[in-house]
Amino acid sequence: SGLQFAVLDGQGFIPFSRV
């Protein structure tokens, strides 16, 4: 339960959630 966002990695965007 928290904000959902994505991070840009060498292979592309990796979406993940964090509290």
From Swiss-Prot:
Please tell me where this protein is predominantly located: secreted
Listed transmembrane segments: none
Keywords, in A-Z order: Amidation, Neuropeptide, Secreted
Q: Which residues carry this modification: Valine amide?
A: V19
Which terms in the GO cellular component ontology are assigned? Answer: extracellular region
Task: Please tell me whether the keyword Zinc is annotated for this protein.
Answer: no
UniProt record, GO biological process: neuropeptide signaling pathway
Which subcellular locations apply to this protein?
A: Secreted
Role of this protein: Mediates visceral muscle contractile activity (myotropic activity).
Describe the family membership recorded for this protein in Swiss-Prot or TrEMBL: Belongs to the periviscerokinin family.
Name of the protein: CAPA-Periviscerokinin-2
